[in-house]
Amino acid sequence: LYPNKMRTIKILLAAGFLLVFGTSIHAQVQRNETYLPKFAIKTNALYWATSTPNLGIEVGLAKKLTLDISGNYNPWKFGDDRQIKHWLVQPELRYWLCERFNGSFFGLHGHYGEMNVSNLNIFGMGHDRYDGNLYGAGISYGYQWIISKRWSMEATIGVGYARLEYDKYARGDGGEKLGHNTHNYFGPTKIGLSFIYVIK
């Protein structure tokens, strides 16, 4: 009889666990369906690490669809003729696999910006000074973790294309103009580790 009683107890415990777990999941789903965030602001910590102030907003369009728009601006000049002066706007349409502002998403983004960079060899162009603009598009994947009702964290990475059109100058103030060039870039176009505050 003892083994039969133990088996019955195990079955009852398992059934109770499944009942509680299922009820909890159902309540969570109901809560998420009645309250999905609609609007959030964010900032990318990785851009701040390059001394680039930045801010983004994200707006809910449907249960699994959002529009993210980020912008950054860097006016600084450093020593040894180094500078990464630029502004950039990057809108992105996101499709969420679970629900918006939660879990995995795929994105389609565009970008446009103007730059005045020197002695950095970005995009593999060399160490001269480059004054011009860029535009293009890409795809991305990201994941968002909910920390609390108002706070979240997000990691994202994207690849794509950028067309650069620029005037090339010798390094230094008043450097000689060396020509006008274009450059087609394929590679990473988006990377982020962002902190998010949900407004509503």
Predicted regions mapped to residue ranges:
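Outer-membrane beta-barrel "beta-signal"
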Residues: 95-96, 185-200
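Repeated loop/turn-to-beta-strand initiation elements of outer-membrane beta-barrel proteins
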Residues: 64-67, 101, 149-153
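Transmembrane beta-strands of outer-membrane beta-barrel pores
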Residues: 45-49, 71-77, 95, 110-116, ...
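Flexible, solvent-exposed loop segments that connect beta-strands
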Residues: 72-86, 114-135, 164-184
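Cleavable N-terminal export/targeting peptides
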Residues: 1-34, 199-200
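Feature captures outer-membrane beta-barrel proteins of Gram-negative bacteria and organelles
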Residues: 29-32, 53-68, 88-97
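Residues that define the transmembrane beta-barrel architecture of outer-membrane proteins
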Residues: 37-39, 49-53, 83-89, 102, ...
